[in-house]
Amino acid sequence: MTLGDEIRLLLEAPTMNASDVRTLLRRDHDEALQIARDMYESESGDERRALFKRLKPVLAAHSRAEEREVYDALLSKTTDEGQDIAHEGYVGHGVLDDLLERMARSRKTESDEWKAHAKVLVELLARHIEEEQGEMFEALAEQFNDDEREAMGRRFLAAKSRMAMKAKAA
């Protein structure tokens, strides 16, 4: 976490409560990025594989729930800028999904090529998160009131739970 991130957290803290969708998204982002970094930094192919198996469903559930409850809300309610943010989010998730699928097809988690894929995943994920926690969080604050963001947070958690249960069943 950069100094700028820490300052932003401190400034947002008074306006973000535990059920605000931005707080929930930030928690998910932190968890996913940490798993991805641990996976990339691991020297063990077996550990990379285990971390990847943990990361993939976490990202899938988060992404689908975020698309359904956050991006779609931005598309339906906000300005052109908010809609652009949502469209970019969908594209970013698609790129991450494609990379995750490519990594899932490779069984050689100990290889330099797989580690290169993991590094690119970390970089893409970090950039995607940075954009969301900047532009998207700002759009959410401007376009939705506290009650709407809390309701969005509840719907996000419910959707994420449904997506996680689907992933387990598959």
Predicted regions mapped to residue ranges:
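Small-residue-biased structural context
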Residues: 1-170
